[in-house]
Amino acid sequence: MGIKIGHASFDERVEKGIDNLFMRQAVSSAQERLKLAKAKAEEELGDWQEWRTLAEEIRSHTLDNLDYYLEQLSDNVSKNGGYVYFAQTAEEANVYIKEIAMKQQAKKIIKSKSMVTEEIGMNQALESIGCEVIESDLGEYILQIDDHDPPSHIVAPALHKNKEQIRETFKEKKGYSKSANPQELTLFAREQLRKEFLQADIGITGCNFAVAESGSITLVTNEGNARLATTIPKTQITVMGMERIVPTWEELDILVSMLCRSAVGQKLTSYVTGLTSTKEAGDVDGPEEFHLVIVDNGRSNILGTEFQAALHCIRCAACINVCPIYRHVGGHSYGSIYPGPIGAVLTPLLEGYDDHEELPYASSLCAACTDACPVKIPLHELLIKHRRVIAEQEKRTPLSESLAMKGFGLVASQPNLFKMGTKGAPYVLSPLTKDGSIKKGPGPLKGWTDIRDLPAAKKERFRDWFKTRGKGNIHHDSTTRDLSQ
């Protein structure tokens, strides 16, 4: 699939999202539910801000010493009997994974939820050599059989679908004949997937966090599918972004606590799995061969820059769950497998601005995302930095907008010009004004007036209003008098 999803323009995607009433209602309901659950989990933990600071320090320290911890991880995985491959690009990662599949003569591959495998387009790469890849996460499974519909949320990929739509998908693709009852739908999916686990030649997982000190990988799930993917197939492949690492189990304990509470409002998910070695003598299950693929794919270019904090992300989607923009347009509007505020920051860093220059502007800069982030990523500040890069370094600002801003800057910096401008604006704009508002504006105003009215400029300037009403006619209470003395 890759990071980019679809070929529609940003405006087309947003319009489609706004027109999808069900999606907007589903997102709104989910945001409210998750926000309340997270708040309760924070309160139960206590000292939430101190926990956030500690989590931020862990992520910052790890990234500042990433080369050391990756080397330690690699050495320990090798000591445990596994193989490690560092992939600089998505293509390199896919070539290595395909080589393993061909060597094992794999026909069927079972896979647990993984954002980085979506990012590198791994499924499509394996399908190109004749492998059948089965998604075992329920949400991802629904999307896969629905003609590879892309995910719209980092944690809940099928958030944009309702139970009736899922029933129709199961009926059309898998012969389902029962109701749209969620329990019946889940049991049906379970029956379908269980046989896939038993027949799989290779199991592939993502990695929530790798533990450098022991060479372990950890998986945090609520469905248990990842455990089956790592115990039944004889060969296991784990794919991880190079930043998804912690120094020790002690730091893991803290970050998993933050991840579960921030993602779904739970103290702990149903399954937290740590895997360290291949199957040993006497073991009844587990892989006989283990491969860890560590993916760069642009991450090293972010290290040491003003955007490095974006790599602190632990993929909890807390920022998405409070974002007012995501609430109204949904995940697909971002045109990336990484939606929401973190997607608007991360996607241009990994893919460039050519297809994603609108994303940093898909924000009200309300900072709700920054306040929600369990590792204190200053998301709204990073979005502003992106805008500055787009305007000053990339020179991508539309000419009309650039000229308008330069013109305003010139006028605003010259008191006499500003006075003339505010005095003349109502008369200049009067041909466009009707019933106290501008309904169709020219140039830079067009984007605004295409979807909302712009209040007309008043003929009485604020300075004139203040001269006649401000000084002598505004009541000053004791507080005001004290402050003015």
From Swiss-Prot:
Gene3D superfamilies: Alpha-helical ferredoxin, NagB/RpiA/CoA transferase-like
GO biological process: lactate metabolic process
Pfam families: Fer4_8 (PF13183), LUD_dom (PF02589), LutB_C (PF11870)
Residues involved in [4Fe-4S] cluster 1 binding: 313, 316, 319, 373
Keyword Electron transport: yes
Keywords: 4Fe-4S, Electron transport, Iron, Iron-sulfur, Metal-binding, Repeat, Transport
Residue stretches making up the 4Fe-4S ferredoxin-type domain: 304-334, 353-382
GO terms assigned for molecular function: 4 iron, 4 sulfur cluster binding; metal ion binding
Sites where the protein binds [4Fe-4S] cluster 2: 323, 366, 369
InterPro entries reported in the protein's UniProt record: 4Fe4S_Fe-S-bd (IPR017896), 4Fe4S_Fe_S_CS (IPR017900), FTHF_cligase-like_sf (IPR024185), Helical_ferredxn (IPR009051), LUD_dom (IPR003741), LutB (IPR022825), LutB/LldF (IPR004452), LutB_C (IPR024569)
PANTHER family: LACTATE UTILIZATION PROTEIN B
Family: Belongs to the LutB/YkgF family.
Annotated protein name in UniProt: Lactate utilization protein B
Lineage: Bacteria, Bacillati, Bacillota, Bacilli, Bacillales
Gene that encodes the chain: lutB
